[in-house]
Design a protein with these regions (language model features):
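Active-site helix-to-loop segments that bind/position phosphate- or nucleotide-bearing substrates
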Residues: 1-182
Length: 182
């Protein structure tokens, strides 16, 4: 350990304070509002009470500061999520489009990303073995896309300050989450 003082320092900090999570990591921004969160919950038929929602959703650290989860659920999360579309099969291909989502309540961002999947899912004609009718084939499976997006957001290592990355190529979609399964 003496040869690696940074690792030793990190290990002792981990043993003393535990693993950094979105619940115990203070938000980078403390002047947060939650109007959109109330609207989102209301649209699902769930009533949040202003007096208790912070405790019920565990939006504060033990020191009373807003935590990272509060920042993610606030009206401005300061966390952009980008969808990059390339014309070919690699990042060396021309960049066709970049669409930015986020900087919003993460629940709204998730809904927007899932709706954008409908735009991306181009129907292609499969002319192989055609007799009379051609077969319409979507670019990807809707359910698989939905599951991958939700997992990328849920399992992302938000405490490291990185967002999931979605890249669309001519033959596939890559959804990268900077986290691990718990």
């Amino acid at each position: 350990m003496k040869d690696y003082p940074e690792r030793e320092k990190k290990l002792f900090r981990l043993l003393d304070q535990g693993i950094d999570t979105i619940e115990n990591t203070p938000a980078q921004y403390q002047n947060l509002t939650f109007h959109k969160l109330f609207g989102y919950y209301g649209s699902k038929g769930i009533v949040l009470r202003k007096e208790t929602f912070e405790d019920n959703l565990e939006l504060r650290t033990n020191d009373g500061e807003y935590n990272l989860m509060a920042q993610l659920l606030s009206d401005n999360s300061h966390m952009p999520l980008r969808v990059s579309i390339f014309t070919g099969r690699t990042k060396g291909s021309n960049l066709y489009s970049v669409r930015e989502f986020g900087n919003d309540c993460l629940l709204y961002t998730l809904d927007e990303l899932l709706r954008y999947g409908d735009v991306l899912n181009i129907i292609q004609a499969d002319e192989r073995d055609r007799i009379v009718e051609r077969k319409d084939v979507p670019l990807f499976d809707d359910k698989a896309f939905r599951e991958a997006i939700i997992n990328a957001i849920l399992h992302n290592a938000w405490v490291e300050g990185n967002e999931p990355m979605i890249t669309v190529y001519s033959d596939r979609i890559e959804i990268m989450s900077r986290g691990t399964l718990v």
